[in-house]
Amino acid sequence: MACKISPGANSASLPGHPNKVICERVRLQSLFPLLPSDQNTTVQEDAHFKAFFQSEDSPSPKRQRLSHSVFDYTSASPAPSPPMRPWEMTSNRQPPSVRPSQHHFSGERCNTPARNRRSPPVRRQRGRRDRLSRHNSISQDENYHHLPYAQQQAIEEPRAFHPPNVSPRLLHPAAHPPQQNAVMVDIHDQLHQGTVPVSYTVTTVAPHGIPLCTGQHIPACSTQQVPGCSVVFSGQHLPVCSVPPPMLQACSVQHLPVPYAAFPPLISSDPFLIHPPHLSPHHPPHLPPPGQFVPFQTQQSRSPLQRIENEVELLGEHLPVGGFTYPPSAHPPTLPPSAPLQFLTHDPLHQEVSFGVPYPPFMPRRLTGRSRYRSQQPIPPPPYHPSLLPYVLSMLPVPPAVGPTFSFELDVEDGEVENYEALLNLAERLGEAKPRGLTKADIEQLPSYRFNPNNHQSEQTLCVVCMCDFESRQLLRVLPCNHEFHAKCVDKWLKANRTCPICRADASEVHRDSE
């Protein structure tokens, strides 16, 4: 005899999702025989369910709005099961021997009193844990309830783990608050049966709120282009996913099944070394190998060079931050061979490709490149000093008809040209350059006599050169200006100068006039 179970009038006001009521009824009916289908038993069951669910925490208002439906299970016309959410698969997955049948019920009647219909303590704790996990994760799947029912059934059929659709606005690092609730997934239940494709996100509570993504394929991150993720160790940004394509996705490098042994190094508390993930033997041949994982010691040795170079600017014109999305496909598109990124250092003429190159051969090559660049620089020319050769040549007493013709092309500035013209004007006023002193023949042609104090007619009584008085019988020399001097004193003066020591008159001109 088929048993028709209806929540009744009292169960319409029960809090929580209808799945809770159905699961509790099915579990109790599978463990104990059914009671006679009378009104008193139904009322007692409804009172028991109401008392059981009111003892737990009240769900959010959104869950209450979605729970206004009544399910009627019969053996003849079973209703389709509601869509199962990804986070409920772990809690509802049970062995076939324990899992109750949701479509067919036994025809036996229950003889157990209503007061003994209590769930075992272990099952109640598991139900409370599942409800808490679903209550914490309801803030992250706002867009999940808006999917059509047909799409939810299509998602449920493969029975594989599919993360909920996430809005593109949540992908930006600024949209993640520091205390964001993460989706709680029981990895032990998912992976105890073998190798299962699992995608998950580990959120680190960092000062900047940067998500730490694994090197595996994350479908929620593959809809928008975001710069690569990085881990913060002691204030230093170290890249985790070294992905060189021109349009970087948010760590969506590989899409491969990963065994459970690859995840503990990423979840462990060892802050000094990031272990590379183990490659599965089912790695697709058309995809590149996983991203390069460098130990922390190697990454830390690069930080002094970054502090010395003081601001390395990444040329990111070809890295858009959103707007373009890849079309949905079964496999991720094959990454084209991309050009390495270039870094602009302080030397604008010396750029090197430094993306993806390990650090030990990178630093000597960079230093040798800089030294080679410095050694190839040309020696700067000496500063220009204008020559005085034209001025000296203009002072030479060479007739223009006899002397050679000189042509000078002076590549000087305007100020130097003006100075040169001023020197030429001065040379024209002074005349031709003449020897400074007189020759010995010219000096001997000057008149001289012996001093006699008795017949001396000049008023000059001393030599201005030696400042001594004239004495008797001393040889005096008279210049054309009638100034008298000791012959020895004035001859020595005239050898270096051609003028009179007293009046500065030219002794040679006077001498020529007298001739």
Curated annotation (Swiss-Prot):
Basic residues: bias regions: 115-134
Residue ranges with Polar residues bias: 89-104
A molecular function GO annotation: ubiquitin protein ligase activity
Keyword Metal-binding: yes
Keywords: Metal-binding, Nucleus, Transferase, Ubl conjugation pathway, Zinc, Zinc-finger
EC numbers for this chain: 2.3.2.27
SUPFAM superfamilies: RING/U-box (SSF57850)
Top-rank EC class of the record's enzyme: transferase
Expression sites (tissue/organ): Widely expressed with highest levels in testis.
Motif mapping: Bipartite nuclear localization signal 2: 115-131
Superkingdom, taxonomy of origin: Eukaryota
A Pfam family annotated for this UniProt entry: zf-RING_2
GO cellular component: nucleoplasm; nucleus; sperm flagellum
Physiological role: Acts as an E3 ubiquitin-protein ligase able to ubiquitinate p53/TP53 which promotes its relocalization to discrete foci associated with PML nuclear bodies. Exhibits preference for UBE2D2 as a E2 enzyme.
Record's protein name: E3 ubiquitin-protein ligase RNF38
Organism (species): Homo sapiens (Human)
